[in-house]
UniProtKB/Swiss-Prot annotation:
It comes from the Eukaryota. Keywords: DNA-directed RNA polymerase, Nucleus, Transcription. This is DNA-directed RNA polymerases II, IV and V subunit 11. The keyword Chloroplast does not apply. GO terms for molecular function: DNA binding; DNA-directed RNA polymerase activity; protein dimerization activity.
Length: 116
């Protein structure tokens, strides 16, 4: 079969960056971020977080091919922000949100564990 090895879905090859940045030369304040070894799960979460930013005019992602494990996130921002700032802010906000969820979950588990 022509399918790649399973480990290739999540192991970033040596010498390959996890995230690469490509500025769009045709549109001002637009760029693409290629994220290696990720899929729709991360792409959709990052896209939705970018949509919360009022300085983001467009945010979308695509999975170029089902057997190539990378996503391309495209961002177009207003002149008040840059795509790099918007991307970094989205990642930081998601990190805080997931940390909060983790802490809340652990607190509830601890409450439940103490009951028994």
């Amino acid at each position: 079969m022509n399918a790649p090895e399973r480990y290739e879905r999540f192991v970033v090859p040596e010498g390959t960056k996890k995230v690469s940045y490509d500025r769009d030369t045709k549109i001002i304040n637009a760029a693409s971020f290629t994220v290696e070894r990720e899929d729709h799960t991360i792409g959709n979460i990052v896209r939705m977080q970018l949509h919360r930013d009022e300085n983001v005019l467009f945010a979308g992602y695509q999975l170029p091919h089902p057997l190539k494990y990378k996503i391309i996130v495209r961002i177009h921002t207003t002149s008040q922000s840059s795509p790099m700032q918007a991307y970094n802010q989205a990642i930081n906000d998601l990190d805080k949100e997931l940390d909060y969820l983790k802490n809340q979950f652990e607190a509830e588990v601890a409450k439940f564990s103490n009951q028994f």
